[in-house]
């Protein structure tokens, strides 16, 4: 006899917003979503800021969203953890940071601080640099060199001078610190093994061969005059302020997101590095805020927090079968992030990865691979052996990032067509579906003055539970979805899953 499946269906980047202006969610013709919305219990939940472990007002994203959904609790993100440690003083007691400083003091050498200089909050936050400067001052370090990477992607394209001026004011206030080199993130934070870019940043940091300017400000202004924005500022040295990274020095890299900090770190802290010819620095103490990758020999300031009893682990412990299914763009989200940062499959778990289309930008193919995902899921459902399904439709988010209204409307209409077939099939099998989202995006793809808006939103996301006769709580957060799934599956919720089922009892 076929099992009765319970499915979590994530419409990526699909949120509630009153205004119709630039709102693909409202403007799309979506008869299936509307049919379920009008027939079954609904609510809306928060998917941003403090509700998902980010700072107040910070928009959510797919990684954070899926991690909170799978964990069934608020998962404090690196940015929030670090901010909290600075606020409560633990930061200044941190062993790794103090070891880096002790290394400098015992060698009478220099402390170098690497990091993205902005308050974007995606890769780093410049206030963490300020805390490092305060710590160095407190511990009596005399030589502190800041190697600043300019943003222009997660913040305004030309906002670097503001951050430079504020940092220089901090140098003056504390009486330590100076800008030694400046690089656009295009060079210092590449992630696609374009070593010719990294080499330019490396040369500026090591005080080898790079353009030289009297001040950081002067160098940035020269780039602006050449039509470059912050991201693309060619790495330069600040005259008489850079001694290079030398034997016996220490480096602290304060980016907390690994993907764009790993390559530069490998140049300094991977003895087997082969991207280009480097002069190894001897007796270098290298510390990174989080673990960037396995090849880097670094001391880790904030170790990863292990998440136990995620939805997948509970399913395994209750001998339930589960399927994770998505197209390439969101496959890591339904697997690695949904499982709390774990790559291995659980017992009883299987996965279906559908290739995303090979197009330059997804507005050229708004349906992406939604139909193929739907067909693969129907095939899996026909086997009749599934207890739990976690499905992601990528389209509203990936096409929403284009900031183009018509393609985003088409994306949602394609997903709605697929949603109808999938949910009706689950209902035919006497199963249940929770239809929801991980964060906003397609709910606003145009600004008020009709400019493309390519970022996520902080709007709440809808929840439909296809079970008649139940009432849902009026508010909640992403961390309440896993408890709701367990409720539908009649599985006991473990203590460390602190979210609450959205179903009122």
From Swiss-Prot:
Bridged cysteine pairs (disulfide): none
Cofactor binding note from Swiss-Prot or TrEMBL: Binds 2 manganese ions per subunit.
Active site feature: 62
Alphabetized CDD domains for the sequence: iPGM
Superkingdom of this protein's organism: Bacteria
Record pathway: Carbohydrate degradation; glycolysis; pyruvate from D-glyceraldehyde 3-phosphate: step 3/5
Any one GO molecular function term: phosphoglycerate mutase activity
Positions contributing to Mn(2+) 2 binding: 12, 62, 438-439
Catalytic activity: (2R)-2-phosphoglycerate = (2R)-3-phosphoglycerate
Similarity comment: Belongs to the BPG-independent phosphoglycerate mutase family.
UniProt function note: Catalyzes the interconversion of 2-phosphoglycerate and 3-phosphoglycerate.
Subunit: Monomer.
Protein name per Swiss-Prot or TrEMBL: 2,3-bisphosphoglycerate-independent phosphoglycerate mutase
Species this protein is from: Staphylococcus aureus (strain MRSA252)
Encoding gene per record: gpmI
């Amino acid at each position: 006899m076929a099992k009765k499946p319970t499915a979590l269906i994530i419409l990526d980047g699909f949120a509630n917003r009153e205004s119709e202006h630039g709102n693909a969610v409202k403007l799309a013709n979506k008869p299936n979503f509307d049919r379920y919305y009008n027939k079954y219990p609904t609510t809306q939940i928060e998917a941003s800021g403090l509700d998902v472990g980010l700072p107040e007002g910070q928009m959510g994203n797919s990684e954070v969203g899926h991690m909170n959904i799978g964990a069934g609790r608020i998962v404090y993100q690196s940015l929030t953890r670090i901010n909290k440690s600075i606020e409560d003083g633990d930061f200044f007691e941190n062993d790794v940071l103090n070891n880096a400083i002790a290394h400098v003091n015992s060698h009478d050498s220099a402390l170098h601080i690497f990091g993205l200089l902005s308050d974007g909050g995606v890769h780093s936050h410049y206030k963490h640099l300020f805390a490092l400067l305060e710590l160095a001052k407190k511990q009596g370090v005399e030589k502190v060199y800041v190697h600043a990477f300019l943003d222009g992607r997660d913040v305004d394209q030309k906002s670097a001078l503001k951050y430079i001026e504020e940092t220089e004011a901090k140098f003056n206030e504390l009486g330590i610190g100076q800008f030694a080199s400046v690089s656009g993130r295009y060079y210092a934070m590449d992630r696609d093994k374009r070593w010719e870019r990294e080499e330019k940043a490396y040369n500026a940091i090591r005080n080898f061969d790079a353009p030289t300017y009297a001040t950081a400000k002067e160098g940035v202004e020269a780039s602006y005059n050449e039509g470059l924005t912050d991201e693309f500022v060619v790495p330069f040295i600040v005259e008489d302020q850079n001694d290079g990274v030398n034997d016996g020095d220490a480096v602290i890299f304060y980016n907390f997101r690994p993907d764009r900090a790993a390559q530069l770190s490998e140049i300094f802290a991977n003895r087997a590095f082969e991207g280009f010819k480097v002069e190894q620095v001897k007796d270098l103490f290298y510390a990174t805020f989080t673990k960037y990758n396995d090849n880097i020999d670094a001391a880790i300031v904030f170790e990863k927090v292990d998440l136990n009893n995620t939805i997948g682990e509970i399913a395994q412990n209750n001998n339930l079968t589960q399927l994770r299914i998505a197209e390439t763009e969101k496959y890591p989200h339904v697997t690695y992030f949904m499982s709390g940062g774990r790559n291995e499959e659980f017992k009883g778990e299987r996965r279906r990865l559908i290739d995303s289309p090979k197009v330059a930008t997804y507005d050229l193919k708004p349906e992406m691979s939604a139909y193929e995902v739907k067909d693969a899921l129907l095939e899996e459902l026909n086997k009749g052996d599934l207890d739990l399904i976690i499905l992601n439709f990528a389209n509203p988010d990936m096409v929403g990032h284009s900031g183009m209204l018509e393609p985003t409307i088409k994306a949602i209409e394609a997903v709605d067509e697929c949603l109808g077939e999938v949910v009706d099939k689950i209902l035919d099998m006497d199963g249940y579906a929770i239809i929801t989202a991980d964060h906003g995006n397609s709910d606003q793809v145009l600004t008020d003055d009709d400019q493309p808006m390519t970022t996520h939103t902080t709007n709440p996301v809808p929840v439909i539970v296809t079970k008649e006769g139940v009432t849902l709580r009026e508010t909640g957060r992403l961390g309440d979805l896993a408890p709701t799934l367990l409720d539908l599956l009649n599985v006991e919720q473990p203590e460390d899953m602190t979210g609450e089922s959205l179903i009122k009892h």
